[in-house]
Amino acid sequence: MAKTSRSVMIAKGLQRVLNVGLLLLAAILIVFLVKETIHLAKVLFVNNEESTSYLLIEGIVIYFLYFEFIALIVKYFESGYHFPLRYFIYIGITAIIRLIIVDHENPIDTLIYSAAILLLVVTLYLANTDRLKRE
């Protein structure tokens, strides 16, 4: 009985530490999200057309990455301390899209990144089927 009680206390203590850590991470991500918003506003008003469009698109994708991580943390607390797999897949797809936008000089690499996105989309489809869906 005492061993079970102690293990429950340890689990609850570790859960609190994890929750506090995630709240701190969410606060840091919100700060970066605000900084990225300011950066996007500055890039929007720069006159150099070609570099501005690349910087703007890259900034928007980074913005979505921050947004998705914050949404993942919110979903963690809403779903009873559980990270849904599909949010990690969304983040992976967005990160690879950002990589393609930033580094698109080698066609073979771009093809491999595209295949990785296709694999993640298939994984997302399978994870959302009724047999695997937890939510």
From Swiss-Prot:
Q: Does the keyword Transmembrane apply?
A: yes
Q: Where in the cell is it found?
A: Cell inner membrane
> Which cellular component appears as one GO term in the record?
plasma membrane
What InterPro entries does the annotation carry? P_starv_induced_PsiE (IPR009315), P_starv_induced_PsiE-like (IPR020948)
Q: Does the keyword Cell inner membrane apply?
A: yes
Record keywords, A-Z: Cell inner membrane, Cell membrane, Membrane, Transmembrane, Transmembrane helix
GO process terms (BP): cellular response to phosphate starvation
- Note the topology in the membrane: Multi-pass membrane protein
User: Where is the chain membrane-spanning?
Assistant: 20-40, 54-74, 82-102, 107-127
Q: Which domain of life is it from?
A: Bacteria
Family per UniProt?
A: Belongs to the PsiE family.
Q: What is this protein called?
A: Protein PsiE homolog
By which gene is this protein encoded?
psiE
